[in-house]
């Protein structure tokens, strides 16, 4: 999606965009923190896309950061099943993942984890805003530090910047 956006908007060399997008997306998903291009200059859509990727993180068995794709997948199936139960109130719909039933206890723990993750994110972002940082830096700094991603978004902690220029209070 990001690659198609860059080709349409910039109309530059196809291969350069493909390599840059794939590298930066994998870097954000895996939490390695490397960047090849200043993706904050690609426009607003990539910033939102990378912010979402910071939250999602990698796969379940990896040591990457974020909520993890497995939990997001289970949450999606849970919401879908709840909507189906609203449409078909008498239906018995079990949540299945890889052809096996997901226990209610696991669903509850995943929803609790995601809820706490988002709550902590909003608390961190609010605290960073109180230190005098702008909105984009506060939001991306909270997401980046909570998800252990590395690069943030915005001018102060963008792809080719670091956290050294932030106020001391925000580093604690």
Q: What positions do the PLM features span?
A:
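Membrane-proximal intracellular helices of multi-pass ion channels
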Residues: 1-172
């Amino acid at each position: 999606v990001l690659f198609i956006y860059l080709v349409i908007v910039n109309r530059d060399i196809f291969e350069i965009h493909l390599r840059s997008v794939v590298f930066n997306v994998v870097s954000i998903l895996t939490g390695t923190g490397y960047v090849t291009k200043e993706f904050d200059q690609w426009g607003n859509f990539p910033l939102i896309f990378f912010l979402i990727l910071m939250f999602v993180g990698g796969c379940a068995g990896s040591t990457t950061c974020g909520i993890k794709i497995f939990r997001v997948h289970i949450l999606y199936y849970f919401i879908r099943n709840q909507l189906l139960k609203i449409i078909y109130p008498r239906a018995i719909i079990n949540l299945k993942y890889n052809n096996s039933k997901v226990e209610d206890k696991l669903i509850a723990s995943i929803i609790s984890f995601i809820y706490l993750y988002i709550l902590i994110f909003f608390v961190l972002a609010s605290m960073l805003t109180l230190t005098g940082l702008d909105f984009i830096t506060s939001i991306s700094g909270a997401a980046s530090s909570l998800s252990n991603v590395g690069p943030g978004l915005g001018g102060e902690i963008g792809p080719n910047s670091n956290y050294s220029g932030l106020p001391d209070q925000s580093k604690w």
